[in-house]
């Protein structure tokens, strides 16, 4: 065994021991979190803390004790800190999609309309609801029943139910019924799991049926009017959503944020439709949050 391998084994053993101690003595949780969130932590210490945090989260999850109510950008959200999207925020204070959150804060105004396609547990719907105020509208689409229930609970927790309309549809290129693929990760599901940007992190297994609707059809039925911003994050089905809203893309949308890769089919569709693009957030080995605005709009 090499010296590096021996050191790695030692680090793993100490990390497991640290997690076991915190698991037995909850009073140690606060100082551990403070250490993990300290700015300027050297890389080796962060790696050690990361291993200990993962082991601790696993133990909490086995005890059905891994859910925490977190304060994120002024919103109260109950999340499972063992799941990847909440893990680093809880243990290391890393923000959720900071570029997109910062853009919302500068772009949305009181009275605006925000559409959240793939709202999940509702972080961006909550943030937008605060920004558009009681005179604005937030329209959230979330077909996954469990995620939609969490979204509704978060609206109640933050006293924002009157500002957010929640719909059970999956936006798509046709209206009807489609098969959604459930991941072992409770908050994620996709119409096209082989195109999901997190397919290398999670596996998709069980399926269930969901109602689908073209956004143009929904918009015509509800006389939606001008939309200041639409966020589309639908686990690989972004192109299907865009193909169901050509009228909205021609008029009625001031900006679109898409989770997609540069030069993807969805990216090319928007650029061919006359939208300019800039990146808000980038992720290692993953898609980007990309902002699209009509060329006629000066930002």
What label would you give each PLM region?
Residues 2-299:
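Phosphate/nucleotide-binding beta-alpha loop and adjacent structural elements of enzyme active sites
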């Amino acid at each position: 065994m090499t010296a590096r391998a021996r050191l790695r084994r030692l680090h793993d053993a100490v990390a497991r021991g640290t997690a076991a101690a915190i698991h037995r003595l909850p009073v140690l949780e606060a100082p551990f979190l403070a250490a993990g969130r300290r700015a300027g932590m050297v890389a080796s210490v962060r790696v050690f803390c990361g291993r200990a945090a993962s082991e601790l989260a696993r133990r909490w999850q086995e005890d059905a004790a891994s859910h925490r109510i977190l304060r994120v950008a002024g919103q109260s959200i109950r999340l499972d800190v063992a799941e990847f999207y909440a893990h680093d925020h809880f243990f290391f204070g890393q923000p959720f999609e900071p570029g997109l959150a910062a853009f919302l804060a500068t772009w949305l105004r009181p009275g605006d309309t925000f559409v959240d396609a793939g709202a999940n547990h509702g972080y961006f719907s909550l943030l937008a609801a605060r920004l558009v105020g009681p005179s604005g509208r937030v329209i959230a689409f979330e077909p996954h029943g469990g995620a939609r229930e969490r979204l509704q609970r978060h609206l109640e927790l933050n006293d924002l139910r009157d500002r957010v309309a929640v719909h059970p549809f999956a936006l798509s290129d046709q209206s009807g019924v489609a098969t959604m693929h459930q991941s072992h990760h409770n908050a994620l599901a996709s119409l096209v799991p082989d195109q999901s940007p997190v397919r290398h992190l999670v596996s998709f297994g069980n399926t269930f049926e969901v109602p689908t609707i073209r956004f143009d059809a929904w918009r015509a039925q509800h006389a939606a009017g001008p939309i200041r911003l639409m966020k589309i994050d639908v686990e690989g089905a972004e192109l299907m959503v865009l193909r169901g809203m050509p009228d909205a893309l021609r008029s009625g949308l001031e900006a679109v944020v898409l989770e997609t890769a540069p030069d993807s089919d969805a990216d090319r569709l928007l650029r061919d439709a006359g939208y300019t693009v800039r990146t808000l957030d980038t992720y290692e080995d993953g898609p980007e949050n990309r902002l699209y605005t009509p060329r006629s709009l000066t930002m």
